[in-house]
Amino acid sequence: MGQSTETKEMIADYMENGFLNDIIDMFKNDRRLFTFLGGLIADERSRVRLGTVALVEELREMYINEIARAIPDIAESLNAVNPIIRADAAYLLGVINHKNALPYLSKAVNDENPLVREAVEETIAFISDLSEEIGTN
């Protein structure tokens, strides 16, 4: 566990310092790193969360299976104390755009924070609309 915690922290620190392209290459070369997406979106540093979204946007098409497996860990952040992290997690689930996120989002639809509720509702609508449009996900 110590090794994986250190690796996640190293990735988060690189993300905060703007080394997104290096992180993208790391994820391409080691698919096990996708397990860190949940921890990265839960990071208190906004640059880390923003970088996590950019990372997923960049890798979504090629690595959707690996990213989809991280949905439960990402969804844990829908219960974070910080409402900004909850909203960012909802947004990231929308970027992933996979139907497996819908049960987690449905549980968060009555969040106490109006911005989180709005993010959750928009993400549910987006995933549902796109799923109906293409008949998959």
Language-model features and meaning:
Residues E44-R45, V81-N82, E112-N113:
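Short inter-helical turns and helix N-cap capping residues of alpha-solenoid HEAT/ARM repeat scaffolds
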